[in-house]
Structures are given as C-alpha cells and as structure tokens.
Amino acid sequence: MINTSFAGLKLVSPIIVGSNSQTANIQKIVEFEKAGAGAIVLKSLFEESIMREISSLGNDDHPEAYDYLSGYVSEKVVTDYLALIAEAKKRCTIPIIPSIACHSDGKWEEFAKRMQGAGADALELNVMSLSTSRVYKDGDFERIHYKIVENVVKLVNIPVIVKIGSNHSNITSLCDGLYARGAKAVVLFNRLFPTDIDVDRLTFTIGQALTSPADLSLPLRWAGIVSASVPQIDIAVSGGVDSWKGIAKSILSGAKAVEVASAIIREGASWITNANKLLEEWQQSKGFNAPENYLGNMNAAEPENEDKLLRTQFLKYFSEIH
C-alpha cells in the first residue's frame, strides 16, 4: 500500500496535486481524485491579484465609491473561492487544501478563517517574495514568514502548511521557526514567476513555466537535511517530480508527500494512476510495505548521507570519476 500522512492528514497516496489552473476546475478535481491523488491543493488565491484589481479601480475622484468597489472586488474573488472549496468538499473525499499566495501579513489573513468554514481540510500559505533592498536588517525576510504563520494559526484550527522559497540563508532554521509558530508542514519549494528576455524585440517574456527532472535536486537535498534536523515538521517536495522515481527519491530523502503539477499538466490525470502503480511495485520489490518503511532512509541523520547532502563543491566529485 502507498497510504501515508502529511500535516496530520491521511492520504491514500503521497501524490498531492499542486496548485495550478486545473485545480480551479471542479471536474478536474474530481478526475484527479478518481485517478488516485492523495490530496488536492486548489489554485492559489493571490493576495497580489486582489490588491491589483482594487488598485486598478482608482480612487482620486470618488473615495467613497472606491471604498465600496474595492470591498466588492475582494469579496467577489473570495466568495468565488469559498464556493470552489465547498463544492470540492461536497464532491470529493480526499483532503482539499486551499492555497493563499502571499508576501505580507495583512487583511487577507481573515480569509483563512472563512476557508476553514467552507470545509477546508488544511491551509497552504504560499509565501512568495524577493528581498532585494540594500537597506536590509538580517532576519527581516524570515520574520515576515513567522508573522504570517502566527496570525493565521490564531484564526484557524486546521493544519497550516507553508510553501517556502529556496532563497533563504538558512532553510533549516526557517523550518524550525515555522514549526515553533504553529506550522504543521512545509513544502520545499515554491517557484518564482519565470522571467526571460526576447533579444529581438527587447521585451520581457515568460520563461520556462513547467518544471523538469533537473529541478528536483535542490528540494531533495533540503528535504534530506531538514527532515534530519527538524523531524517534527512534515515535509513535501515540490518541483521536478515527473515520475514514480521522483516520489521514491523524495520519500527516501525524508518527505512524506510530493506536490506535482507540471507532470499532470503534461500527461493528464493518468499520470497519477501510473505513478501510484509503479511506486507500489517498486516498494514491493524492495520489501517495503508502505512509504513509512523507507521514509528518510537516505536523509542527513546518517553521517554517511550527511556528507553527500552537505557537499557544495564539485572538486571531490570530479576527482572520484576521473
């Protein structure tokens, strides 16, 4: 069997369908459950998009009208999202996890309680931000994460999951701090908007939107390190899982689950069914009855593994193969 648990939720599979455009579609959500998904993360409610819609209204001439319309815009977006949560819970039995993509603490935190009321099984906070200021006090970036989690945990009693970026100086310390403030799990890692440049038109374009297997290396490394250092917080790997092997690698590194979007977008819901089948066959061939039997077997808790995971230079590697 491939049953597991993550953030206190029971999953029939370690495959969590990650937030993407398809998880805003109730028919697709039902299809993913039938294919064998362990849980669904709904398409993120973007703090940024709500604020942008409000800003586009303008408020120079009629401030009272602006206040009314801005309230309507944000309420409409949130109400539609709450309806999606309720419908998904009505149609599915697996955990439904709404996602808020945010970069600051503020009014949006009130949405969290309403999502819980709509039936959410857990809440994913996708903290997306870049720290680029020259005037920067050490730890400010991390403190934003802590404040967001503290505020949300006060409002809900469902598990809070935090999806973080890889752009932190000490990811282990951040995960430890998030757990201390009430987070039940972390997802390693979110992905910033991919930017590219068209050298003919001299314009910005969208870079590679979907992940590839090469993207798996970084979250694997940190899953192996964090699961050994902060074993009390659950981990999910996100980015680069394109086959059952990526799932097995993630669990061996210490992740209890994986969030997958790109592979499912490319291949459809059948990818979930096939990956589940092949993962279970591999488990049986290795003598494992369930993911918990090999969870973290290759994390940094073993000195031999720690040496490999903490290696940052290529020199020793090349000297071994030449």
PLM regions: where:
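Glycine-rich phosphate/pyrophosphate-binding beta-alpha loops
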Residues: 19-23
